[in-house]
A protein has these predicted regions:
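Onset of an N-terminal alpha helix
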Residues: 3-11
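Helix-turn-helix
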Residues: 9, 17-51, 55
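N-terminal intrinsically disordered/low-complexity leader segments
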Residues: 1-4, 16
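Amphipathic alpha-helical linker/stalk segments
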Residues: 56-69
């Protein structure tokens, strides 16, 4: 998988978990387990949970705008 593919996969998984559980209840470890990556990958691509959340929301918005311009 390329770096872009890994980053995108993490965003998809994180978006689903944040949507289902909310920011407070979603954990980086849970996201890592479902995305099949380690915590270092989250830190490498996003820095921290808050930044991951922001990027996941931006990603969801992009997907919505593509679907319904």
């Amino acid at each position: 998988m390329s770096k872009d593919d890994i980053r995108g996969h993490i965003l998809e998984v994180a978006g689903a978990i944040f949507a289902a559980e909310g920011f407070q209840n979603a954990t980086v470890r849970k996201i890592c387990a479902q995305a099949d990556v380690n915590v270092a990958a989250i830190n490498y691509y996003f820095g921290d949970k808050e930044r991951l959340y922001i990027e996941a929301v931006k990603n969801a918005r992009r997907l919505i705008e593509r679907r319904w311009p």
